[in-house]
Amino acid sequence: MKPIAHIHTDLPQKFGIPRNSFLAPHLQGRIIFEPEFALDTAVEGLDEFSHLWLLWEFQNGTPGGAAADIAADLATKDKSGATSKWTPSVRPPRLGGVERRGVFATRSPFRPNPIGLTCVKLDHVELTPQGPVIHVLAADLRDGTPIYDIKPYIPFADCHPEATGGWIEDAPWHELEVDFPDQLRARFAALAEASKLEGLIEVLHQDPRRAGSKHEPDRVYHLAYAGLDVAFTVDRDVLHVLGVD
């Protein structure tokens, strides 16, 4: 198999990528086709659907991306994405990174085959001289992730109201409160597209830190987003944005 496209998002590094799609519903993404598949006829009728399935590839244990950004992950001493080796049991973030579950009962990236499956909202299809561009929302993918297939979400086949969520139902995710001063919001809007601010705030709500991170209220974290460096601290349940550069 070979990629048919790559998705471009505002998250170039592993740090900050939502742990599932739709946790940051306003996070923007653009799917750019490889020249062989950049044909208007290939997407005819796609804009009649509201949601899509994306099949994609994990690279080095994380959604794919540029080598420089993967190296930046390693420089932070987060080794969780440094190898693609799979393990039969994993520690899901939703369980605080402590309890284990079987890999096939989770969506861990450390699998026998590095295949990812994501549902996204279709915003619109743009036809350009270079080929169609699919604009999506709510993806949980790093910038540059290779896409292997795109399929429409079909409600009568894909939606199962009676479905149960297993152990996840007993482990609700706790979001952080985000303190984002007005002057820093204005600075973000001056340096980047204002429409990207809502997605950033949603990413911060999800707590970008590793599951089980110890309480270090004075530690300054840095999130790469939309070409900017967003600095913040976390004190208990509140994330404080300190700077946008």
Predicted regions and their residues:
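Glycine-rich, low-complexity intrinsically disordered segments
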Residues: 1-119, 123-245
